[in-house]
Amino acid sequence: MASITPEGGALYGLPPPIQTLPRALADPWEDDATPADLLRVAQAAEAAGLDFVGVCDHVAVPDDDYASGMRTTWYDPVATLAWLGARTESIRLLSVVLIAAYRHPLLTASSFGTLAHLTDERVILGVGAGHVEGEFAALGIDYHRRGKLLDECIDAVRGAFADTYVSHDGPEYSYRDVGVGPAPASGDLPIWVGGSGSAAWKRTGRRGDGYIPMGASRDQYPEIIDTIRTAADEAGRSDATFDIGIMPGWAYIGDP
């Protein structure tokens, strides 16, 4: 496990518009936007020197009160990152966040190992627990076990690249002597944890390489960093370094 920056530090990026259309955030022009517009935003972010673009993840948005602020357009993160990766050169490609419980960890390892292989290791696997209970129900996944599923998924994805054939025996997933490839050339896939509370901060310290603040104010950062470091120490990771993936909001200058 390793941070992207040698000593750990802040990286700045944005979740491009268009690929996700929550009602509260989408602007009218996005309704008619095309993949070419999405690409233009990503290439502009690269030209401006941003560190990453981030693509969100929802699979089956329910028609209920909780999800009433969500539309049904959410581009698949793996397909979208692959497409953007083929049309950019240096900007990193982040899932922000992949809801780990929705996919078997071997599938996640295969998808993101392939992305890393195809994009000169520009991929960051950002993972989270998820929050839309109706979506879990639609997929037949126990919403109340999402934290445990996330923890085991992180461990299993890391382990998938440890050798040519690997085995895993956990409470949620079990398999023996299977190979996953291609793997990242370095043998390591950066994994960032996203979330808005102390559970995500502690999970970062115990298992992650970086943290994605989601809705955190700047004055919370000292507490977040202290919690990550304490959790890392308690997990025997005192020497670990961590990145922070910061996504400021965007502002339009002129017409989109």
Where are these regions (language model features)?
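Acidic-and-aromatic substrate-binding clefts and catalytic sites of carbohydrate-active enzymes
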Residues: 62, 71-73, 100-106, 215-223, ...
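Glycine-enriched alpha-helix->loop->beta-strand junction motifs that scaffold or abut catalytic
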Residues: 87-90, 119, 205-212
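N-terminal beta1-alpha1-beta2 module of alpha/beta enzyme domains
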Residues: 1-87, 189
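Flexible, glycine- and charge-enriched loops at secondary-structure boundaries
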Residues: 28-35, 70, 74, 143-150, ...
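Internal, glycine-rich beta/alpha segment that forms the wall or movable "lid"
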Residues: 2-8, 63-67, 82, 95, ...
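Active-site mouth loops of central-metabolism enzymes
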Residues: 18-36, 96-106, 185-196, 247-256
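Conserved beta-strand positions in the central sheet of alpha/beta enzyme cores
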Residues: 13, 54, 126, 212-213
